[in-house]
């Protein structure tokens, strides 16, 4: 699966799995930029995928097959992503004089075990050699990005796509796909200037602090749209099944009294403000943790993606709470997509940010 990174095709098929749906994106690569060939978001039945774990691989494969057939997608090679919460991502520094074979042996057979919260033999590990620098002792070091997942996670994804009649060529981490989607925007920041990528997903929020295109800090907070919907349903005394519909119509109040939880606020506003207030506190802790790792570190902007980023005025809410400019990701605009991309409603676009990044990766 890893060796295929170096073989390229002109089309990319990206498929993202989450507890609510399967997102499918097919892009055609042209010199003038990527063109959207197909895009679909197909709901998953309840109970097939929960808390980042696959419970019914055949059920998910059925949904994938139906989506491909409906949109007349013939491609068989696919790129997908494991959730950030299922991955271990570390930046490590090793002696720069190591050649490629020595570096590979040291990373995979010695260093990896030091950073894994589970046994090395239970892990699939990959790495990327980055640049070199001089450490405080005057020794030249090479920076290496180490990425690992449990083998059972990799096997779950391989099994699903095999059942769907597809060949999974690359399984990466969701935050890497989001970085790819935002590549052009990230290039506008100065060297050493970091941004926070926040993917408000279904079962949690993925936070990545990225500098020079490389994730420096990664964390998943167990607060996602599922929790928002449940809080709204409880506040309104309505069935949980109505939470998704309620969430789509929410606009976050921004006046100064809205954060106090006063009795003049309607129950839905109080519920969502409490959840978002807790989430912004967690994001602030993550940013502060990163800033405390060294001198002259800076986080300049926040990018919001995922299905939770469609809440009205959520960008302004986080701008106020964090004191940092905050932008909702529009992957169509970020990638300058041609084709039928304009037909995708704005309210659906942030949720496709990861899938678009997967489709952008050539295999």
Where are these regions (language model features)?
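Non-catalytic, solvent-exposed interaction/assembly segments
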Residues: 1-111, 115, 155, 165-167
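Small-residue (GG/TT-enriched) beta-loop-alpha framework at ligand/catalytic clefts
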Residues: 13-37, 74, 80, 139-246, ...
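Phosphate/pyrophosphate-binding loops at sites that engage ATP/ADP/AMP, CoA/4′-phosphopantetheine
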Residues: 64-77, 164, 238, 286-301
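Active-site neighborhood for divalent-cation/phosphate handling
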Residues: 77, 81-186, 301, 331-337, ...
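Glycine-rich phosphate-binding/hydrolytic loop that grips phosphoryl groups
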Residues: 180, 309, 327-363
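Feature representing long, continuous alpha-helical segments
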Residues: 230, 270, 274-277, 281, ...
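Adenine-nucleotide phosphate-binding core of ATP-dependent small-molecule kinases
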Residues: 234-235, 245-299
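Glycine-rich phosphate-binding loops at beta-strand->alpha-helix junctions
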Residues: 275, 297-327
